[in-house]
């Protein structure tokens, strides 16, 4: 069955299930070679780089695994718009052209208007502006698109409704359906891309990864003019000391990445600084075609407005942007900061 899945001309969810299974684990090197060839065919030697910018750590949700959960006794910070300008300028000086703006769940201070204002400021400086915030209405997503937002990233965390309820004890994030349906609202509202993912470690990874595939496939069918990207975040240590009930090893994570590259050959796969330098070096160009670099997970972090707040999670790869780019070039890969000019945002 594994050989048939690897040789399939049009792999789908059945082949993905086989490639995610324990039976495929001994064929990891074969999967890696296939994933590398597919990545080279569809994405060349390019690895797109981005940087996250945390705008606010204020949150009223009770996610048991998150360093920003409302029951954490840590100082809360939120950047003023002037501080946002300073942080964006600091990122721009580092050479970044794609920024991901992050907040906690919706609250009175850091709500839609605040996110929109931050997007406008970022769009005046960067060619690509993504947001990883709270679920919004289709109309609100349309407002972000008009302000210059390119797309969203919104992890379902886990697709198992019962586990989701146990992991989100109170607050707006407890609404499973509102979060699940948000990427479709974003694409319907005019955003170009939707980034999906499940937080590996919360639930059975086999179930979550098959559900992630189904979610991505649905969006690709329904919103053919838009794009989908997939991330594979693993739980990292945070202030509350949460221990994942379903720990995922590096070897299993590699198997997941290779399986998705084989079964979704033209979908961008993303890997953040949650992972170690050694692992990220090995995955670059082998399934993964988009990576963060020089990341900070505290509010601010790049300029003079850097806060002393707790980070959302520990960064595992602390290399700066030049060092990370040097690694990519040493592997024969091309770090790319800019995919398109901001002037063409409304042209498609």
Predicted regions and their residues:
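Auxiliary Fe-S-binding modules of radical SAM enzymes
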Residues: 1-26, 92, 220-348
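Short, charged low-complexity linear segments at domain edges
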Residues: 27-48
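Conserved, mostly hydrophobic/aromatic
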Residues: 35, 63, 101, 154, ...
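Active-site phosphate/pyrophosphate- and oxyanion-stabilizing loops and adjacent acidic/basic residues
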Residues: 36-37, 120, 258
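Canonical Radical SAM [4Fe-4S] cluster-binding loop centered on the CxxxCxxC motif
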Residues: 44-83
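Hydrophobic faces of well-ordered beta-strands that scaffold small-molecule active sites
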Residues: 45-51, 99, 129-131, 152-154, ...
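Active-site beta-loop-alpha junctions enriched in small/polar residues
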Residues: 52-54, 104-106, 132-136, 157-159, ...
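Conserved Radical SAM active-site core
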Residues: 72-212, 218
């Amino acid at each position: 069955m594994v050989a048939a899945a690897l040789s399939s001309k049009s792999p789908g969810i059945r082949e993905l299930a086989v490639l995610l299974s324990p039976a495929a684990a001994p064929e990891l090197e074969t999967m890696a070679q296939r994933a590398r060839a597919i990545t080279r065919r569809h994405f060349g030697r390019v690895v797109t780089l981005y940087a996250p910018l945390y705008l606010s750590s204020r949150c009223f949700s009770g996610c048991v695994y998150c360093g920003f959960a409302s029951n954490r006794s840590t100082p809360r910070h939120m950047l003023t718009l002037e501080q946002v300008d300073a942080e964006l300028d600091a990122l721009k000086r580092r050479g970044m052209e794609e920024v991901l703006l992050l907040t906690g769940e919706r609250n009175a201070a850091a709500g839609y208007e605040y996110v929109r204002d931050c997007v406008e400021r970022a769009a005046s400086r960067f060619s690509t502006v993504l947001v990883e915030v709270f679920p919004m209405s289709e109309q609100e997503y349309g407002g972000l698109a008009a302000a210059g937002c390119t797309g969203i990233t919104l992890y379902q965390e886990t697709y198992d409704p019962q586990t989701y309820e146990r992991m989100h004890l109170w607050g707006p994030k407890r609404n499973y359906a509102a979060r699940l349906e948000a990427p479709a609202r974003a694409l319907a509202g005019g955003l170009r891309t939707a980034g999906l993912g499940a937080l590996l470690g919360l639930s059975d990874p086999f179930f979550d990864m098959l559900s992630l595939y189904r979610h991505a496939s649905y969006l690709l069918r329904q919103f053919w003019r838009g794009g989908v990207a997939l991330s594979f975040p693993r739980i990292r240590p945070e202030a509350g000391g949460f221990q994942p009930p379903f720990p995922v090893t590096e070897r299993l994570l590699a198997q997941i990445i290779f399986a998705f590259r084989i079964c979704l050959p033209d979908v961008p796969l993303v890997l953040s600084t949650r992972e170690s330098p050694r692992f990220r070096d090995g995955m670059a160009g082998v399934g993964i075609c988009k990576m963060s670099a020089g990341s900070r997970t505290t509010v601010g972090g790049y300029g003079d407005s850097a806060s002393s707040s707790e980070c959302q999670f520990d960064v595992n790869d602390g290399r700066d942007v030049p060092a990370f780019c040097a690694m990519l070039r040493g592997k024969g890969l091309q770090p790319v900061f800019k995919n398109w000019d901001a002037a063409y945002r409304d042209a498609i």
